[in-house]
């Protein structure tokens, strides 16, 4: 996607402890001043390029299972960007257990998300820790500032999708959603 769009990456570095566990990006690195500083130090950004950040991507939870307070990440990164993507490949179960309150992209009540809040994307590989077939995944979108037009999103999505969809994979997403619905999700995440 970065190659196709011409985006220039500007990395936010996570911490790593002495056990080798990759931790979170420190909160101070998510603040507007830190983002501006790393952009100014980025050798890929020249004077003739608009250096305004437009999209942030954070892995949540990390591969080692550490998870962010998504609400806080949005508050901090919302000072710099209008769109946020949480890569939640291993974290599709979080909404279904109160222990993870505010620690996943689609936290809280969608009705509480204001049009002035950032647009949030979340991707979840439902085949990893939910009951979907291999390669199954979800994309969730909570619209806010600078939301992406649905037809534009669908066109971009279809560029990456197969012209021969595998209906058992699609059906497995429906099944995993049904399994997690209601009391089932809490029961399955309590064990």
Predicted regions and their residues:
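Conserved PLP-enzyme active-site core in the AAT-like
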Residues: 1-191
């Amino acid at each position: 996607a970065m190659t196709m769009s011409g985006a220039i990456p500007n990395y936010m570095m996570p911490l790593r402890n002495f056990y080798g566990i990759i931790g979170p990006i420190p909160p101070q690195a998510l603040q507007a001043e830190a983002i501006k500083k790393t952009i100014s130090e980025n050798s890929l950004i020249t004077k003739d390029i608009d250096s305004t950040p437009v999209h942030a991507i954070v892995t949540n939870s990390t591969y080692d299972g550490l998870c962010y307070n998504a609400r806080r990440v949005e508050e901090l990164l919302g000072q710099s960007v209008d769109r946020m993507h949480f890569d939640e490949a291993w974290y599709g179960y979080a909404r279904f257990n109160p222990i993870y309150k505010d620690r996943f992209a689609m936290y809280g009540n969608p009705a509480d998300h204001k049009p002035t809040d950032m647009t949030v994307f979340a991707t979840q590989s439902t085949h990893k820790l939910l009951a979907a077939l291999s390669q199954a995944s979800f994309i969730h979108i909570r619209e806010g500032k600078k939301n992406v037009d649905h037809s534009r999103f669908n066109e971009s999505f279809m560029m990456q999708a197969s012209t021969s969809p595998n209906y058992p994979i699609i059906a497995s997403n429906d099944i995993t959603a049904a399994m997690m619905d209601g009391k089932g999700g809490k029961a399955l995440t309590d064990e």
